[in-house]
Amino acid sequence: MERSSAVDTGVRKDAGTGFLPKSSSPEIRFKTEDAVINTERSPAAYIEVREDASTGFLPKLPLKTDFPFGIYIHWPYCLSKCPYCDFFSQVKKNVEQEEIIKGYLDDLDFYAELTKERTVTSISFGGGTPSLIKPQLIEKIISHIAQKWPLADNAEISLEANPNSDRPDLFSDLRNAGINRLSLGIQALNDNDLKILGRTHNLKQAYQAMEEVLKRFDNHSIDLIYARPAQNLSQWQQEIKQAASFGFKHLSMYQLTIEEGTVFYKKGLPPAEENLASEMYNFTNRYLSEHGYPQYEISNYAQPGFESRHNQLYWNGSDYLGIGKSAHGRLKIGSKHYALTHHRIMEELTSEERAEELLLMGLRLNRGINKQDFEKQCGLNFDNFINADKLNMLIAEKMLINTNTTIKATDSGRLILNRLIEELCS
């Protein structure tokens, strides 16, 4: 679906850096169908909305809310590109980290003017490979955020890391820099599959990294990929049992998908047989739930209280900023919701677009969607928005569970989420 076009900010990015000139103090303008939102540097706690020339300006609207608010920092650089990865990343061994981080800080300043009365509840460093960032620069980013926004006392500050670092003090340095949640990209628990997946670490390095993370952090997670080439159910069952025994607070289990544009796609690698992938998924849910890791989202399992707070911002439709190349965000200003899809450009979401996003993300969660919250967030009546005939059909197929207050996908339904959304919104 095509979104309404956003207005340009009136200033141009520097061709060399991709960032706006540091000396600029831009006026930010967003065109919508019924309003012009016009904010200049400094009055960021308020916006002015002019509906038409005859009515003039309406009273200023405060931005401050009590909802969670997060900041995502995207580091797109990697030492190598995994053959299954379709995220935006660049293979570069040497980059000017200090200069890039300066640009990130400028972008944080820019958005702080719009949101500085919000309290930051989570910061997440993703990629790419954000563990390549120098720890002192990570500390600089965290400190800068804390200077620009109130930072919640219990803020979750998470970073994704690979197990193959040649820096022996990496994890202690990251902890000292302010990271309090560490997620390790293990992906497989045997050397052969690690090679197939294009990972640059071996199993010995994975175990060493896990030992260090468990020692240095109280909040931690590992990622594994299932439905790998030639993997059978018995092999995955053994791997799940191992993963549950390590003692990590959180586990992410992702089914391998063959995405267009990836190396696996270009090689014509077939996806896993559907029934096998379903068996793996169902065993994962059952075993981890029985061993202290209940599923809370389609790919995520956690000991109670250790669910990823930052990722829940996405699934709950909360506000977050995206900093760095290809990073995106969502932001509510006044009564309007905006998508931050391009560098410092905000595109207004229609109520229908907002509703579709809430459905797509919320149905990933085991608890589903609270209909009252849905209506508050998009301004549409749930029953009027949903295709009632298709809803009843999906309930009969045991893909959805619908009550007076909530709607949620069953285990089977979460495996075909795209189809569910298409049907419900048709």
Residue ranges and their predicted role:
Residues E2-R3, I28-K31, I37, I47, ...:
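N-terminal [4Fe-4S]-dependent radical SAM core
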Residues S5-L20, A35, R41-L58:
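Long, intrinsically disordered low-complexity tandem-repeat segments
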Residues P76-F87:
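Local cysteine-cluster metal-coordination motifs and their immediate loop/turn environment
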Residues N381-M393:
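Short amphipathic alpha-helical interaction segments
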Residues I395-T405:
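A short, conserved structural fragment
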